[in-house]
UniProtKB/Swiss-Prot annotation:
Signal peptide location: 1-21
GO molecular-function terms, A-Z: calcium ion binding; mannosyl-oligosaccharide 1,2-alpha-mannosidase activity
Coiled-coil ranges (or none): none
Taxonomic path: Eukaryota, Metazoa, Chordata, Craniata, Vertebrata
Gene3D superfamilies, alphabetized: 1.50.10.10
Entry-linked InterPro entries: 6hp_glycosidase-like_sf (IPR012341), EDEM1/2/3 (IPR044674), Glyco_hydro_47 (IPR001382), Seven-hairpin_glycosidases (IPR036026)
PTM note: N-glycosylated.
Protein name, entry field: ER degradation-enhancing alpha-mannosidase-like protein 2
Amino acid composition bias (Polar residues), ranges on this chain: 531-540, 547-561
Subcellular location: Endoplasmic reticulum lumen
Pfam families for the chain: Glyco_hydro_47
Native species: Mus musculus
């Protein structure tokens, strides 16, 4: 189907008037401001606990009030939480953490790291924080956003991942040693998401640094997966990156595959890439034809389309949010409501849910405080204003606080049936879960900007428009400003093209009573606003790591020329025009 892609200046398809309340069980509507403050308190309880008990380890162990390294040795929770600090309005702590990361994070270490997790959490987190630095009052260097310490750190981390892509197929290994490259005995079997979840971060990095290698390897990996789809249009779960042969042939939208589909859509919007969107739409047809049953999505055999697992996985709950990005709101809401019934049954989403039996799957009863259903609620609420979506936000706050809160943060729920806890607080709780909850209850947050305000930044390559909205969240909820990808282009013609699009967009707004408020800022040193940090217990000095710490075993992935316009409301249009 022919279509046009529009750079979104709102988060999702169409921003309708928002409802500011949702009926609760007693008939009252939850107050967004009330829940916003409770979410903020949740963040600081977890964040302070990490700083006091776990930094500089990757993650907090909330039951024993200590830390451990998990996905590398990067102070991962601090990187993952950085942009959340700004979204919550804490510029002073953001500034302090930027300094701490520069002084303490080193990627020249003999560590086997997940290529997927390092990209989405470390590279994505550093890129997002880099692009938000000026807004947070950080004194940026001349040439920003095309240069800066966080950008250099992101580039260094990404270069450590490049050896993983040196395979006959161009599809990356799942694990790489940050000092030595791919280990000789490394398994060549990688999950689909571990291959197809790089285009957002790597294309951003190439655009900002001028080095095309990152975007190039990400595109090759995407295309190899596309070429490996079955005759009925489906992809499997795990593939051998040396031979290109599928090892696990289960096809679905959940664990091991999920963010591949997500990045086709988000990559298409971020890069205005018609081909990526066309690829997703073809997949979407096959997914609906073979895996979609009664607004659930099952797992099927990729070559035959026969059902292999009639289960719902909690990671699949991102799908309604993704559907909203392509304008498929009706289907998105129906599927969301199915998933919400599971939440209400258990007070969270179990990792696996047997749909015919209506109950959890053995050994998959846990809920590690995942964000996916809350993420979809945030997107859909921006698109529809349906009060049911606020109800989910309210229920999530109440459940997490009641079940998971402990003295040192929030603990993973090991079993939703009896609410037993596990001694882990994953970094995505601060990067994603809390962030999406806060944005659900904060419709006026700068992340939701619809283009009514923006900044004009002078770079060595000309004027650059930033902060107008349309942020693209990577799969770890790190927001990327799509306009930034046009700030550092070496070809002046590309800059003129962007400026023409900006002028055309704002000419559409001249008839509106409220004109765009524009402030001009120039790159270079400036004095940030002073003020006390709101953080009660900053960790200015990292604690020394103990050599006896046990690490969690590594996993490879988690269980132009075409019409281009700036959209007033932000939308991917699918039509015949």
């Amino acid at each position: 189907m022919p279509f046009r892609l529009l750079i979104p200046l709102g988060l999702v398809c169409v921003l309708l008037p928002l409802h500011h309340g949702a009926p609760g069980p007693d008939g009252t509507a939850p107050d967004p401001a009330h829940y916003r403050e409770r979410v903020k308190a949740m963040f600081y309880h977890a964040y302070d606990s990490y700083l006091e008990n776990a930094f500089p380890y990757d993650e907090l162990r909330p039951l024993t009030c200590d830390g451990h390294d998990t996905w590398g040795s990067f102070s991962l929770t601090l990187i993952d939480a950085l942009d959340t600090l700004l979204i919550l309005g804490n510029t002073s702590e953001f500034q302090r953490v930027v300094e701490v990361l520069q002084d303490n994070v080193d990627f020249d270490i003999d560590v086997n790291a997940s290529v997927f997790e390092t990209n989405i959490r470390v590279v994505g987190g550093l890129l997002s924080a880099h692009l938000l630095s000026k807004k947070a009052g950080v004194e940026v260097e001349a040439g920003w956003p095309c240069s800066g310490p966080l950008l250099r750190m992101a580039e260094e981390a990404a270069r450590k991942l490049l050896p993983a892509f040196q395979t006959p197929t161009g599809m990356p290994y799942g694990t790489v040693n940050l000092l030595h490259g791919v280990n000789p005995g490394e398994t060549p079997v990688t999950c689909t998401a571990g291959i197809g979840t790089f285009i957002v971060e790597f294309a951003t990095l190439s655009s900002l640094t001028g080095d095309p290698v990152f975007e190039d390897v990400a595109r090759v990996a995407l295309m190899r997966l596309w070429e490996s789809r079955s005759d009925i249009g489906l992809v499997g779960n795990h593939i051998d990156v040396l031979t290109g042969k599928w090892v696990a042939q289960d096809a679905g939208i959940g664990a091991g595959v999920d963010s591949y589909f997500e990045y086709l859509v988000k990559g298409a919007i971020l890069l205005q890439d018609k081909k990526l969107m066309a690829m997703f739409l073809e997949y979407n047809k096959a997914i609906r034809n073979y895996t979609h049953f009664d607004d659930w999505y099952l797992w099927v055999q990729m070559y035959k389309g026969t059902v292999s697992m009639p289960v719902f996985q909690s990671l699949e709950a991102y799908w309604p949010g993704l559907q909203s990005l392509i304008g498929d709101i009706d289907n998105a809401m129906r599927t969301f409501l199915n998933y919400y019934t599971v939440w209400k049954q258990f007070g969270g989403l179990p990792e696996f849910y047997n749909i015919p039996q209506g109950y959890t799957v053995e050994k998959r009863e846990g809920y590690p405080l995942r964000p996916e259903l809350i993420e979809s609620a945030m997107y859909l609420y921006r698109a529809t204003g349906d009060p049911t979506l606020l109800e989910l936000g309210r229920d999530a706050v109440e459940s997490i606080e009641k079940i998971s809160k402990v003295e040192c943060g929030f603990a993973t729920i090991k079993d939703l049936r009896d609410h037993k806890l596990d001694n882990r607080m994953e970094s995505f709780f601060l990067a994603e879960t809390v962030k999406y909850l806060y944005l659900l209850f904060h419709p006026n947050n700068f992340i939701h900007n619809n283009g009514s305000t923006f900044d004009s930044v002078m770079t060595p390559h000309g004027e650059c428009i930033l902060g107008a909205g349309g942020y693209i969240f990577n799969t770890e909820a790190h927001p990327i400003d799509p306009a930034a990808l046009h700030c550092c282009r070496r070809l002046k013609e590309e800059q003129w093209e962007v400026e023409d699009l900006i002028k055309e967009f704002y000419s559409l707004k001249q008839s509106r009573p409220k004109r765009a408020q524009r402030k001009t800022v120039r790159s270079g040193p400036w004095e940030p606003q002073s003020g006390p940090a709101t953080l009660s217990s900053p960790a200015n000095q990292p604690r020394e790591k103990q050599p006896a710490q046990q690490r969690t075993p590594l996993l490879s992935c988690p269980s132009q020329p075409f019409t281009s316009k700036l959209a007033l409301l932000g939308q991917v249009f699918l039509d015949s025009s």
